[in-house]
Every structure is written in C-alpha cells, then in structure tokens.
Amino acid sequence: MSKIDTIIEMIEGLNVLELVELKKKMEEKWGVTAAAPVMAMGVAAPVAAAGDGAAAAAPAEEKTEFDVILKEAGPNKIQVIKVVRELTSLGLKEAKDLVEGAPKPVREGVSKEEAEAAKAKLTEVGAVVEIK
C-alpha cells in the first residue's frame, strides 16, 4: 500500500471535528487556505459553521432543503404521472419519462413542508417516495 493510500484511509477514519482541526493545522503549516470557490458558497457555509466547535456543529447538521425522490411508480402509473406534472409543471412526455426512469428526483431543494406535501400526494396514488 502506498503512502497516499495510507493517508487517505487515515483521513476517512476521522470525525468532523478532527477533520476541521486537520484543516486548520494544514492551513497554518503551509500558509494556505481551504476556502471554497465562489460558485460553491452554499456548500462552504456549513463547513465554516462546523469550524466553530461542537456547539456550532449541531445547527449545521439541521437540514433545511430536501429532495423528493420517486423510488417506484407503483400500480397506478398514470395517476403518478398526473401528480408529477402537477408538482413539477413538466409536460406529459417529460413527466412520463421521469416516472418510468424511477428512481429519480421529482422536487429538489424544497422546504420540509413542500417535500412532505409532495410525498403525501404521490403516496396517495400508490407511488413509493423517499425524502432525502
């Protein structure tokens, strides 16, 4: 096993707080910063909050955006397609392709309430749905 592989395995075994400490020490040692590019600022915000210690780590783990994933259409595929069209404003062909290509996301980055409402509508017509 190479040195790189050994290092990767060691890093995989670290928890979040240990990773934050490692990042800080690497920045201090080599005078670099691990700042994310401007386009990835939505991803960088939770990492920055976790760097403030264990107290800040708990709020950073609370999820505010959810994805509604259609796992399986179930027996009432036509009804599921109608609900998918209602939820997404997709055309008939696009909604049919989404339903037939399950598992696929129906809604992404929505609030918990919207995700629960979408899941309820889809499960009501027999679809198998997961919220991530």
UniProtKB/Swiss-Prot annotation:
Q: Gene3D superfamilies, alphabetically?
A: 3.30.1390.10, Single helix bin (1.20.5.710)
Q: Which GO terms describe its molecular function?
A: mRNA binding; structural constituent of ribosome
The terms describing its cellular component in GO are:
cytosolic large ribosomal subunit
Cite a single Pfam family from the UniProt record.
Ribosomal_L12_N
Q: Which UniProt keywords apply?
A: Ribonucleoprotein, Ribosomal protein
GO term, biological process aspect, one: translation
Which SUPFAM superfamilies does the entry link to? ClpS-like, Ribosomal protein L7/12, oligomerisation (N-terminal) domain
What function is annotated for this protein?
Forms part of the ribosomal stalk which helps the ribosome interact with GTP-bound translation factors. Is thus essential for accurate translation.
Please report which protein family the annotation says this sequence is part of.
Belongs to the bacterial ribosomal protein bL12 family.
Q: How does it assemble?
A: Homodimer. Part of the ribosomal stalk of the 50S ribosomal subunit. Forms a multimeric L10(L12)X complex, where L10 forms an elongated spine to which 2 to 4 L12 dimers bind in a sequential fashion. Binds GTP-bound translation factors.
Name assigned to this protein: Large ribosomal subunit protein bL12
Per the UniProt record, the source organism is Chloroflexus aggregans (strain MD-66 / DSM 9485)
